[in-house]
Amino acid sequence: MSDIERLEQEICLALEMAGDEQALEAVRIAALGKKGSISEKLKALGKMSASERQKVGPVLNGLKNRVLELWTQKRDFLRRQAMDACLTRETVDITLPVRSSPIERGRIHPISQVIEEIIAIYMKMGFSLAEGPDIETDYYNFTALNFPEGHPAREMHDTFFFDVNKTGERKLLRTHTSPVQIRTMEKQKAPIRIIIPGKTYRMDSDATHSPMFHQVEGLVIDKTSTIAHMMWLHETFCKAFFEVSSVKMRFRPSFFPFTEPSMEVDIQCDRSGSEVKFGEGQDWLEILGCGMVHPHVLKNVGLDPDEYQGFAWGMGIDRIAMLKYGMPDLRAFFDADLRWLDHYGFRCFDMHAFFPGLRNV
């Protein structure tokens, strides 16, 4: 056995015996450091004849490369071993036993479920999600949206106003999520395609109204969008949300300060039985309001209405949740009654998809 072969065996044995990175580094230095065994032999090549260098040089370089490869493999092995030991030592079991009683299991609230369904449908159509503050200024909630000074929505009996602050400004709880449309158009260049789900507040309370309710609005701004695009969008949404293959819709003229022309949309349904069935029947049910964005609104955010156009719409999330899942009283949504939630809520671990209420999305 030659000296080089014997040296390789010694180094390989030392690498195998190294139990930690510190010992492994010592082996590397002993073999490949400035005064290491392999380094010394490489230095000795200069004293050899040309023929000897041609013979011994490749052998030594091959040994050096093999030792480096073995050293790297052992280092990676030791690091993985140390990480596994650390994870085993620091593991904390955060699981809990499954509760046996059905009423004790957590439920996803129908409002949360419906919001996720709405987001899933619109995001599949290329929309992004936008959010804004619940506490708004008069400008963003009314003025920028073309509400005139004497509009009833500006009155104390319809809107929750805060006291006038030191600067003379009176803030309010937003009455719709439309202020987010203004904020988005101020910050983002066209084209814009957003949906805005969120809480809104109005002084109203009965079986179908609540002082706090959930609303989703949408906005499309570009240079080519028309009423035809808006009608197709609403039809596509209703078919996906109510899980029907076809649906008839009726667009009725209406008035909203921030759109012109404005429309209210009815969807054909059957209300003859105990539940509402969509895609059939001879009844009509109002589902949302919409229209082309008013030129004054575009001007308020610095857009030229001769160049840009678009449409906006809004619908009550609580209302369409009641329609889809057969809930008779809106007030029960906010009573924190576990019996109601056990009946109408969604079990997290019984779901077969991220959005189980949508078979067609």
UniProtKB/Swiss-Prot annotation:
Q: Name one GO cellular component term.
A: cytoplasm
Q: Where in the cell is it found?
A: Cytoplasm
Native organism: Bartonella henselae (strain ATCC 49882 / DSM 28221 / CCUG 30454 / Houston 1) (Rochalimaea henselae)
Name by which UniProt lists this protein: Phenylalanine--tRNA ligase alpha subunit
Question: Which reaction(s) does its UniProt entry say it catalyses?
Answer: tRNA(Phe) + L-phenylalanine + ATP = L-phenylalanyl-tRNA(Phe) + AMP + diphosphate + H(+)
What's the cofactor? Mg(2+)
Q: Which HAMAP family match?
A: Phe_tRNA_synth_alpha1 (MF_00281)
Residues annotated as binding Mg(2+): E260
Bound cofactor: record note: Binds 2 magnesium ions per tetramer.
Kindly list the GO molecular function terms attached to this UniProt entry.
Answer: ATP binding; magnesium ion binding; phenylalanine-tRNA ligase activity; tRNA binding
In short, the EC number is: 6.1.1.20
Instruction: List the gene name.
Output: pheS
Alphabetically ordered keywords of this record: Aminoacyl-tRNA synthetase, ATP-binding, Cytoplasm, Ligase, Magnesium, Metal-binding, Nucleotide-binding, Protein biosynthesis
Q: What is the lineage of its organism?
A: Bacteria, Pseudomonadati, Pseudomonadota, Alphaproteobacteria, Hyphomicrobiales
